[in-house]
Amino acid sequence: MAAKDVKFGNDARVKMLKGVNVLADAVKVTLGPKGRNVVLDKAYGAPTITKDGVSVAREIELEDKFENMGAQMVKEVASKANDAAGDGTTTATVLAQAIVNEGLKAVAAGMNPMDLKRGIDKAVVAVVEELKAISKPCETSKEIEQVGTISANSDETVGKLIAQAMEKVGKEGVITVEDGTGLDDALDVVEGMQFDRGYLSPYFINKPEAGTVELENPYIILVDKKISNIREILPVLEAVAKAGKPLLIVAEDIEGEALATLVVNTMRGIVKVAAVKAPGFGDRRKAMLQDIAILTAGTVISEEIGMELEKATLEELGQAKRVVITKDNTTIIDGIGDEAQIKARVAQIRQQIEDSTSDYDKEKLQERVAKLAGGVAVIKVGAATEVAMKEKKDRVDDALHATRAAVEEGIVPGGGVALVRAASKVATTLTGDNEEQNVGIKLALRAMEAPLRQIVTNAGEEASVVARNVKDGNGNYGYNAGTEQYGDMLEMGILDPPKVTRSALQFAASIAGLMITTECMITDLPKEEKLDPAAAMGGMGGMGGMM
């Protein structure tokens, strides 16, 4: 086992604090409408330019192992805030730094760290409750746009795009962010249910100019197995041909003779058919087939429940207003499924999301909810260079998470004002069990001014003057660092989702409390490079002639 380097008490805390400050100082320059950029060197390609706090934090690794432990703990704050709310990473880092600095001063002055931590925890719980009390619902498209704009560093076009996307696909819909191909941002909306499976044969195409298959008012048969024998599907084909409607076949696979016969019948115009593979794999495929069945009022033909494809009737087939199939995707528009059944299915999937522990599973389940309940919107980010596109994509991602959080938990005045107001209110009523807890409460409430002060500092103004003026006001009164004006933050469109502010505060206080109560730090001693003796003697080969 490697030898260890151990530091105690103040020696350990001073080193840890140095690491905290290095990381936090790098991250906090990005905060606010006039926050600066940070340039990150990459091993290959151009450097990355970003204003995203968590991206900056992830890049920082310090040489001194004790300092690095402090930096890594604050990095954890930024990551946790990012995971919980998708935004607020810089705010969380600034809060953690402020609480740690204030807390360690109190510890150095001889206060009991455990009582300080209890005081900090009490202050945080009280402020979180106060944030809930002052939040108001985020309902209008204008408010959604304002939240998106603020989170994208005052980029109004991003705010507008997100508001439009939410309007189109609803608050349950999935909104994704992709690289665009031009200079301008664009919004693509897919209505209906789309899945990533295209036509099985190009001979099904009936719109050659667009390279797509379009079926109007088709029947849809859903089969949970491979179809290789045409006899299995012949009865359904005959029934559909009599009804004079097109048919979409969604099956695990269609191969050989069955596919060839379908193609020939389509080309001769005997019956209008298109075939696609079922989306997903394994259990997920079964679940998605069931989703399509509920959306189109059909039944999945599955041997597991004793159904045979040869005996399928028109009653077991789903129907939709229109189906569009491209090389890569199938979109089912306006299925005739019962609204109540669709809602019940959505509720069932939501329950699975709550029970799931895997982020990947949650994402896939959320996609299924969107396909059933709303639709899918894709924001395509445009920029002149790849570096600019990456930076903008980070901002759009943050803005998207912030707007989702706002829809979920409402809005509070932004610009650090909500924390200042909540802290001022709590300061008048909250007391600890002893004097040292009171010190913990006071230092936590004082640290909650840090985001406002940092926003003002980054805007080139005097932080203490602005902080005093904001504290003297009440309600939504605050300072707009973008325009350098005081006024009602909600009216000026400076909004924050309380979920983002709350997550930032809770994670910052949690890690800061652990640091304040640290008394010992242990790390591996650096290994000394020992020279290989054989290698050191390497120059003596020419002495072989000595007697």
Curated annotation (Swiss-Prot):
Keywords: ATP-binding, Chaperone, Cytoplasm, Isomerase, Nucleotide-binding. GO terms for cellular component: cytoplasm. It catalyses: ATP + H2O + a folded polypeptide = ADP + phosphate + an unfolded polypeptide. The keyword Nucleotide-binding applies. ATP binds at T30, L31, G32, P33, K51, D87, G88, T89, T90, T91, G415, D496. It holds the Pfam family Cpn60_TCP1. It is found in: Cytoplasm. GO terms for molecular function: ATP binding; ATP-dependent protein folding chaperone; isomerase activity; unfolded protein binding. GO terms for biological process: protein refolding. InterPro entries: Chaperonin_Cpn60_CS, Cpn60/GroEL, Cpn60/GroEL/TCP-1, GroEL-like_apical_dom_sf, GROEL-like_equatorial_sf, TCP-1-like_intermed_sf. It is an enzyme of class 5 (isomerase). Together with its co-chaperonin GroES, plays an essential role in assisting protein folding. The GroEL-GroES system forms a nano-cage that allows encapsulation of the non-native substrate proteins and provides a physical environment optimized to promote and accelerate protein folding. Belongs to the chaperonin (HSP60) family. PANTHER family: 60 KDA HEAT SHOCK PROTEIN, MITOCHONDRIAL. HAMAP family: CH60 (MF_00600). This is Chaperonin GroEL. It comes from Actinobacillus pleuropneumoniae. The gene is groEL.
